[in-house]
């Protein structure tokens, strides 16, 4: 933690093709070793695949997928009287988006398709249809929070 006070959060510039900050953040999440050009090519190719297969606007499909992935509740460990409790808490909007993007990219990387643009396109389409590994992760997170609802009074 910085001792000199609050560090201002830098604003992400929207991407040039879709003029969307969410797309720009996804490109940043896809990027490995600073190769933004490669990451944006992968994403735009994935969006082309989505447009071909669904016939819908890829940005709308992506936003629908993100709404289905982003968690509302999560659990946080809290130590009270020598015991660790998993306390359910609401997820802040910024963290919701961050978790959604992180889960989307990580589960897309684990898929079996040949290229990353195909994997990402499939994961986005699955998430838009409320299926897929990223949506399952959200459901598991919500189940965990629901199971530990008894400890909700330990919130801080």
Curated annotation (Swiss-Prot):
Which PROSITE patterns would you find in this protein's record? RIBOSOMAL_S7
Does the UniProt entry include the keyword Ribosomal protein? yes
Q: Mention one GO biological process in which this protein takes part, according to its record.
A: translation
GO terms for MF: rRNA binding; structural constituent of ribosome; tRNA binding
Checking Gene3D superfamilies in the record gives: Ribosomal protein S7 domain
Look up the signal peptide feature and give its range: none
List, alphabetically, the GO terms of the cellular component aspect. small ribosomal subunit
The entry's keywords: Ribonucleoprotein, Ribosomal protein, RNA-binding, rRNA-binding, tRNA-binding
- InterPro entries documented for this protein: Ribosomal_uS7, Ribosomal_uS7_bac/org-type, Ribosomal_uS7_CS, Ribosomal_uS7_dom, Ribosomal_uS7_dom_sf
Q: How does it assemble?
A: Part of the 30S ribosomal subunit. Contacts proteins S9 and S11.
- What's this protein's family per the entry? Belongs to the universal ribosomal protein uS7 family.
Functionally, this protein is described as follows: One of the primary rRNA binding proteins, it binds directly to 16S rRNA where it nucleates assembly of the head domain of the 30S subunit. Is located at the subunit interface close to the decoding center, probably blocks exit of the E-site tRNA.
Protein name according to UniProt = Small ribosomal subunit protein uS7
């Amino acid at each position: 933690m910085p001792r000199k006070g609050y560090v201002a959060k830098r604003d992400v510039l929207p991407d040039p093709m879709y003029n969307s900050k969410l797309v720009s953040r996804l490109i940043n999440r896809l990027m490995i070793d600073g190769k933004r050009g490669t990451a944006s090519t992968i994403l735009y190719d994935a969006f082309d695949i989505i447009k071909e297969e669904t016939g819908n606007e890829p940005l709308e499909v992506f936003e629908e997928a993100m709404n289905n992935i982003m968690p509302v509740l999560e659990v946080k460990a809290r130590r009270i009287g020598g015991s660790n409790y998993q306390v359910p808490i609401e997820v802040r909007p910024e963290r919701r988006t961050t978790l959604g993007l992180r889960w989307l990219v990580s589960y897309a990387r684990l898929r079996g398709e040949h290229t990353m643009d195909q994997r990402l396109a499939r994961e986005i389409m699955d998430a838009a249809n409320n299926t897929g590994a990223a949506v399952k992760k959200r459901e598991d997170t919500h189940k965990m929070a629901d199971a530990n609802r008894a400890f909700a009074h330990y919130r801080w």
